[in-house]
């Protein structure tokens, strides 16, 4: 079974997924890392944050290649983004050709208070993120819900929204494990 677990940057997805992987024994595959590896091999980017600034066509090509690799895996938690906010608008993180390749059983969206997400982003020196306000983060979380609903209609997978309350990643992880096991 393949599960797709998503959330906006700074929601605490990596922390929660580390716990989920440990508790479930299911490997986590980072979709963005696969895309980055392909883009870097092609000389298109030097760091992962540059991917979202590539042309739409290039991003689509990278999505296809990463989706095909994941589709070959028997059991995995796919760590990705439901939608990608670009200078041109929101790009589906899982367009039709990727949905077919991945064939997920469930989409889980991890959410948190937008003000907390902003604070986490502001305090993370390891990433070169665009400066977004609380309203923009809220909008992105809402867009993720819309994309998840559309993906579910197409794929038949269920959608689960999990709150990652401040200081309680274990609680969010436990809820996710119950859904994906």
From Swiss-Prot:
Gene3D superfamilies: P-loop containing nucleotide triphosphate hydrolases
Binding site for ATP: 7-15
Pfam families: AAA_17 (PF13207)
Known EC number: 2.7.4.3
InterPro entries registered for this protein in UniProt: Adenylate_kinase_AdkA (IPR023477), P-loop_NTPase (IPR027417)
Reactions catalysed: AMP + ATP = 2 ADP
Coiled coil ranges: none
An example Gene Ontology molecular-function term: adenylate kinase activity
Organism superkingdom: Archaea
Annotated compartments: Cytoplasm
Keywords: ATP-binding, Cytoplasm, Kinase, Nucleotide-binding, Transferase
Family classification: Belongs to the archaeal adenylate kinase family.
Name recorded for this polypeptide: Adenylate kinase
Organism name: Thermoplasma volcanium (strain ATCC 51530 / DSM 4299 / JCM 9571 / NBRC 15438 / GSS1)
Taxonomic classification: Archaea, Methanobacteriati, Thermoplasmatota, Thermoplasmata, Thermoplasmatales
Gene name tied to this protein: adkA
